[in-house]
C-alpha cells in the first residue's frame, strides 16, 4: 500500500447540517456547501495544514438546505474557487435548491475565461457511464443515484472516497433499505470503508 498523506475532518456548524473535508494526494474535497461563522476558521485552518489556499472539489450530496445553503454556497465559490463541483443529479424541488443550481451556473459563466471549471451533475446516466470499480484501488466510486426516486432523500449522492491511505463513505441523506442492502453487498464497501458519514 503506497503512503499518501490523508486527512478527514468533520466540522461543527452551530446549527443543523453537515460539513466535512477529505484530503488525499494533495487533493482537497469539501463535502457539502455549508460555511457558517462556526466552521469558517476551522476550514481555513484545515486548508492551511494541507498547504492549500483553494478547494479542488466541492461535493454536494443533496439540494436540501442543511447540505447546501444558497448564501454559503456563494461564499464558498467566491472564497475558495473550486476547480470541480459535483452536484446532485435530481431536479431541485425547493426554492433554495433551484437558486443554488443557478448560483453554480453563474459561477461557471464567471470563470469561463479565467480557468477551466468542471461541474458534474451526478445523474444515474453519469454513474452508468463510469468504469466498474476494482477492489483496493485508488479511484473514487460513485454508488448512487442509480435511479431517480420520488423521495428526494433517496436521490442523494453516495460516494466512496478512496484516494488516500484510508477511505470515507459518504451516504448523503439516503433512507431506502433497498439502496442500503445493495450497498452492503458491494465488496468495496464491505472491505474498504474506514469512515462512514451516515445519513441524518
PLM regions and their residue ranges:
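Active-site HxH/HxHxD metal-binding segment of metal-dependent hydrolases
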Residues: 57, 65-112
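Short acidic, S/G/P-rich loop/turn micro-motifs used as interaction or catalytic elements
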Residues: 35-38, 64-68, 91-94, 175-178
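Residue-level detector of solvent-exposed, low-hydrophobicity positions
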Residues: 27, 69-70, 114, 133
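Metallo-beta-lactamase
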Residues: 55-66, 196-200
Amino acid at each position: 500500500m503506497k503512503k499518501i498523506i490523508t486527512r478527514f475532518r468533520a466540522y461543527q456548524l452551530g446549527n443543523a447540517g453537515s460539513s466535512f473535508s477529505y484530503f488525499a494526494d494533495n487533493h482537497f474535497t469539501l463535502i457539502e456547501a455549508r460555511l457558517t461563522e462556526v466552521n469558517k476558521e476551522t476550514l481555513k485552518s484545515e486548508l492551511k495544514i494541507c498547504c492549500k489556499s483553494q478547494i479542488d472539489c466541492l461535493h454536494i450530496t443533496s439540494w436540501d438546505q442543511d447540505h447546501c445553503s444558497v448564501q454559503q454556497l456563494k461564499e464558498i465559490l467566491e472564497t475558495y474557487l473550486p476547480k470541480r463541483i459535483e452536484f446532485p443529479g435530481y431536479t431541485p424541488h425547493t426554492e433554495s435548491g433551484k437558486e443554488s443550481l443557478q448560483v453554480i451556473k453563474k459561477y461557471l459563466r464567471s470563470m469561463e475565461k479565467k480557468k477551466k471549471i468542471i461541474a458534474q451533475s451526478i445523474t444515474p446516466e453519469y454513474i452508468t457511464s463510469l468504469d466498474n470499480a476494482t477492489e483496493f484501488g485508488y479511484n473514487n466510486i460513485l454508488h448512487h443515484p442509480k435511479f431517480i426516486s420520488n423521495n428526494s432523500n433517496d436521490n442523494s449522492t453516495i460516494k466512496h472516497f478512496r484516494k488516500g491511505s484510508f477511505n470515507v463513505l459518504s451516504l448523503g441523506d439516503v433512507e431506502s433499505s433497498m439502496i442500503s442492502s445493495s450497498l452492503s453487498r458491494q465488496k468495496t464497501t464491505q472491505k474498504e470503508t474506514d469512515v462512514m458519514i451516515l445519513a441524518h
